Amino acid sequence: MNFETSRCATLQYCPDPYIQRFIETPSHFSWKESYYRSAMSQSTQTSEFLSPEVFQHIWDFLEQPICSVQPIDLNFVDEPSENGATNKIEISMDCIRMQDSDLSDPMWPQYTNLGLLNGMDQQIQNGSSSTSPYNTDHAQNSVTAPSPYAQPSSTFDALSPSPAIPSNTDYPGPHSFDVSFQQSSTAKSATWTYSTELKKLYCQIAKTCPIQIKVMTPPPQGAVIRAMPVYKKAEHVTEVVKRCPNHELSREFNEGQIAPPSHLIRVEGNSHAQYVEDPITGRQSVLVPYEPPQVGTEFTTVLYNFMCNSSCVGGMNRRPILIIVTLETRDGQVLGRRCFEARICACPGRDRKADEDSIRKQQVSDSAKNGDGTKRPFRQNTHGIQMTSIKKRRSPDDELLYLPVRGRETYEMLLKIKESLELMQYLPQHTIETYRQQQQQQHQHLLQKQTSMQSQSSYGNSSPPLNKMNSMNKLPSVSQLINPQQRNALTPTTMPEGMGANIPMMGTHMPMAGDMNGLSPTQALPPPLSMPSTSHCTPPPPYPTDCSIVSFLARLGCSSCLDYFTTQGLTTIYQIEHYSMDDLASLKIPEQFRHAIWKGILDHRQLHDFSSPPHLLRTPSGASTVSVGSSETRGERVIDAVRFTLRQTISFPPRDEWNDFNFDMDSRRNKQQRIKEEGE
């Protein structure tokens, strides 16, 4: 049996010996002629089905579609002997993509395998509506993945900032995208400097300015970094930032440059840079492929040049600009965004010092106005006595401050500290002394209990740290030391202004387990303070932010087992969250630590089931992003179709030649008739 297959695909075929399908062929044809006639009839039907007229209606539906067809043909032929029958199976599959898109878009057409062509090489062909990967050139030459940054079929040409007004909101994204600058000099001779106080870059024209790109997790393959200038003020934001006509038309800085002369931002030292101008909004930007940091570094450095002064007439004309740096996928989805102000001037150090001095003077002036007040003194005459109102001065103790906290445990701990400090102001001195005496007694009892437990504990038991925490929770809280008379006296009307503003977090605090254990059965629970709950922030979800193996083992008290994991390349807890006891034993972890680590993995699983990972949580904002890569969001209609055709042709010799193959139907009928007569 010989198999005639295409060069790039093989499929093992086992013919079914129990085929009971007969094709009646004319008796005056030989078996070869019958086979040829049958095959031709099948191919005729197939050619009609594969003709362009069949899909013409679908193509007309998409007006001006771009189509790509990837055919796969597999032929299996059972070669006959001299006088034998044949069996032929033909399988064809066409992967068709039809898209309603602009014909100038170099991203389409291209092949799509829809996940069915494993191991097949994909090609991107420009200007062709239907190609086949099984031509002679493809078979003879070794196929290598083309560079995604090669000209002219670059994938960056399809990316463009769709919004008319790009967003300037910082968005770290799922990869914690960040942009930073090196330590810069403030001397007048410096070619560039960055002010962290003003979040502003000062640089000279056409001078190299290194910008450091950092991500916590590697972005997808083919990610790019885009830099785009926009005007800062609302009255200018709709205009496109370009170079002034003087610098654009002059030969200086333009001869021998790949970048268009109108682009403000250029990239130095990167041959893969792509300069893009949006055909709709006209905004100009420059794209470079993301490169991971080199060994021993945390940053990826991109060298930018700014090719026009901020004071140039006909260009920026002293209007402030912002530089928006985004991390994007190959199809334009924004993975992170950072923004900073830029000023291109002749003396960056001098301008930075002047701006910082000006902002400091303004802050001092604002603080002085807020302290002295701007209203006139109120005068009131009563019985001939002139009264002047006292000016209110804000006390530093009444100032409201907000502290962002990461982690539920830290938040609850700081909440208790805040509650205790505020309640301390209303406790009498003898109550405080009684509390301190009880605290010392509890501390001595805790030390004795901990000493006895350490002498009885065995290896592998992680209960001592937990028991220690439980003992700490059983300590009496400050709220229990207040008698009912003092507690009823704590009302919003008797508290100072600063105290009443900070109390809402106390009003939402529920008694802990340790607080309820300190109460007697007959003693009622202390009523909570009736304060409106107007907390300005929502606590973060109970999910561990540090997911490294080091911190995981440190929490379990098993830091000595770190080498067993790092030698196997295990660095995060997500790599071992599905491990079993057998897997831990295979890592040769000592038995005394194995149970503690297994219990920690189970706790992590339970926590993981009821919370979302931090890299999947996004803060909603009004930031607009570019296209998310879906053709639906771009207003395009895409139809992906896969057509399978299975055709089996079985040919037998004519009836006159059946006697040669012991397949005489007349003799079989006579034999069956004789058996029937003998049975009667």
Curated annotation (Swiss-Prot):
SUPFAM superfamilies, alphabetized: p53 tetramerization domain, p53-like transcription factors, SAM/Pointed domain
Tissue specificity: Widely expressed, notably in thymus, prostate, placenta, and skeletal muscle, although the precise isoform varies according to tissue type. Progenitor cell layers of skin, breast and prostate express high levels of DeltaN-type isoforms.
Keyword Transferase carried by entry: no
Biased composition (Low complexity): 437-463
Cofactor: Zn(2+)
Alphabetical list of Gene3D superfamilies matching this protein: 2.60.40.720, p53-like tetramerisation domain, Transcription Factor, Ets-1
Region listing for Transcription activation, in residue ranges: 1-107
Biased composition (Polar residues): 122-157, 379-389
Domain comment quoted from the record: The transactivation inhibitory domain (TID) can interact with, and inhibit the activity of the N-terminal transcriptional activation domain of TA*-type isoforms.
PANTHER family per UniProt: CELLULAR TUMOR ANTIGEN P53, TUMOR PROTEIN 63
Record text on subunit structure and interactions: Binds DNA as a homotetramer. Isoform composition of the tetramer may determine transactivation activity. Interacts with HIPK2. Interacts with SSRP1, leading to stimulate coactivator activity. Interacts with WWP1. Interacts with PDS5A. Interacts (via activation domain) with NOC2L.
Protein name from the UniProt record: Tumor protein 63
Naturally occurring in which organism (per UniProt): Rattus norvegicus (Rat)
